[in-house]
Amino acid sequence: MQGERKWHMLLTIFFLLITSGQCMDSKEVTQKERRTLLDLILQVIRDSQQREKNTSRRCIAGLLTSAQDMKLSSPEKPFYIPRLDNSRLIEIFPRDLNMKGKFIQHFTAGPVKFSSECRIQFHRLYHNTRDCSRPAYYKRCARLLTRLAMSPLCMQS
């Protein structure tokens, strides 16, 4: 299904690029007005990259205090998207890093304890499954962790 969507999108973009170039072939159009869709797209990309370099430095220095800057490491800094109309920047902040732990502690009614024999299974379940890596499945993750804690392997010691 996704492959079909990509194919349709590529085909649509291809036809748009071809037709935009052919519409400009009339003799009444001056050279200044003769710009293809591809030229416009490339210009917008170049402008946004230049604007991003200039504005992101200014905004990061102005919006974050030194405590917030120290708290956020480099991959967690907000991502700024420049707007075409130069009104305001859109800020995208990352999710709370401890949110998964908070959710699971809430759903299991307290911290879940694991013995040393269960540590490997807990680590695999907590860090490598879809249930524990996506916020929509945290409730399912809490149920799986509770079942693991009650399993005979983990109850031995």
Swiss-Prot record:
GO molecular function annotations of the record: cytokine activity; receptor signaling protein tyrosine kinase activator activity; receptor tyrosine kinase binding
Signal peptide coordinates: 1-23
Family under the similarity heading: Belongs to the ALKAL family.
Keywords in alphabetical order: Secreted, Signal
GO CC, alphabetical: extracellular region
GO biological process entries: positive regulation of ERK1 and ERK2 cascade; positive regulation of ERK5 cascade
Protein name according to UniProt: Protein ALKAL-like
Highest taxon above the source species: Eukaryota
Compartment(s): Secreted
Organism: Tetraodon nigroviridis (Spotted green pufferfish)
A Pfam cross-reference name: ALKL1_2
